[in-house]
Design a protein with these regions (language model features):
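Active-site catalytic motif of lipid deacylating hydrolases and related acyltransferases
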Residues: 29-73, 84-180, 258-280
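N-terminal charge/polar-biased segments
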Residues: 15-17, 27, 31-46, 86, ...
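N-terminal post-signal-peptidase region of extra-cytosolic proteins
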Residues: 78-84
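Short, surface-exposed, polar/charged, turn-prone segments marking secondary-structure boundaries
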Residues: 125-127, 161-163, 211-213, 236-241, ...
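Serine-dependent carboxylesterase/thioesterase catalytic core
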Residues: 26, 163-236
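Positively charged n-region of N-terminal signal peptides that target proteins for export
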Residues: 1-6
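Lipolytic serine-hydrolase domain surface
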Residues: 221-301
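Hydrophobic membrane-insertion alpha-helices, especially the h-region
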Residues: 10-23
């Protein structure tokens, strides 16, 4: 009997040590975001010609990196290279649009069907008014166990560190490209970090945001220069409204084969169906609201 108790104690102790180790690793783990071109599968942009970047711009990028990552030279270099490459791509553009995905934060706009249609719609509207634009992804997490833990921790704290990272990138662009307009796009949980960035950059009149389907527990801090959609005009967004009964009922029907899930239509963290939690340019209400927002803020034709 005593040996069994000792064995049980050993098992419990090992479990506690394992959980403690995971907890310590999760707390210390922090993944740097990647702002990248569409279609590159998350690879950071490459700086074609460093000599074409003014020295003052390069120095400011280094200063920002040190402020964010301290003496971690690898992270600093990674951050600086991204900043300067994006600066080089954006310096002759009128608009930069940055997509913040929902789910766990590692999806791309080209694999998010609803927002891909919206991106194309916005780009077309800007182009028809004679504006040039650069469309980017911002991947804030990696697809791994620690990546999930890090994302969950950030989500709970309102993306305190990840929002500062992204806000620094945007502030850098708008400082060194004075006529540039930046539109932040946030889908579902990505709307939380988008709102947090807008709060940090509340006084930056060059930055705007479009958010769709923010979670029901999140209350937007900043509404100036911001469009928040919680209804696609077809079905009320059950996730934004916290309509748990609709979510549960819809998933039960799918579980027992009474309905078939449709790829790209309303899921939470890539797994749970949420009726109405999808936004497409083809939806007349979505198209109208976004087009109206663009025309009011940017005097589109």
């Amino acid at each position: 009997m005593l040996s069994k108790i000792r064995w049980l104690g050993v098992v419990i102790a090992l479990d506690l040590i394992l959980l403690l180790g995971i907890g310590v690793q999760a707390v210390s783990y922090s993944e740097s975001g990647v702002t990248c071109d569409i279609g590159t599968e998350g690879l950071p942009p490459l700086l074609a010609d460093l000599l074409a970047v003014p020295q003052s711009v390069a120095d400011d990028a280094s200063r920002l990196a040190t402020g964010l990552f301290g003496d971690c030279q690898e992270k600093c270099d990674y951050f600086v290279n991204q900043l300067l490459a994006i600066y080089s791509e954006a310096k002759d553009k009128d608009f930069v649009m940055i997509f913040n995905p929902g789910g766990w934060g590692w999806d791309f706009v080209e694999t998010s069907p609803g927002w891909w249609s919206i991106f194309n719609g916005i780009e077309s509207e800007l182009e028809s008014s004679g504006y040039t634009s650069l469309m980017l992804n911002h991947r804030r997490a990696v697809d791994s166990f620690l990546g999930r833990l890090d994302e969950a921790r950030e989500m709970i704290t309102g993306y305190k560190s990840k929002a500062m990272d992204l806000a620094s990138r945007i502030e850098f662009l708008t400082t060194h490209i004075p006529d540039l307009k930046v539109i932040l796009a946030g889908e579902s949980t990505g709307a939380i970090i988008t709102d947090s960035v807008m709060k940090i950059l509340a006084d930056n009149q060059q930055v705007y945001s479009i958010q769709t389907g923010p979670p029901f527990w999140h209350q937007n801090n900043i509404l100036d220069r911001t469009l928040v959609l919680t209804d696609n005009g077809i079905v009320p967004d059950s996730f934004s409204r916290g309509d748990f009964w609709t979510i549960i009922w819809d998933n039960l029907k799918a579980l027992f084969g009474f309905s078939q899930p449709v790829d790209g239509f309303g899921t939470i963290l890539n797994y749970v169906e949420a009726p109405g939690h999808d936004y497409w340019w083809q939806y007349s209400e979505v198209c109208f609201e976004i087009t109206n927002f663009l025309r009011q803020n940017f005097a589109l034709k």
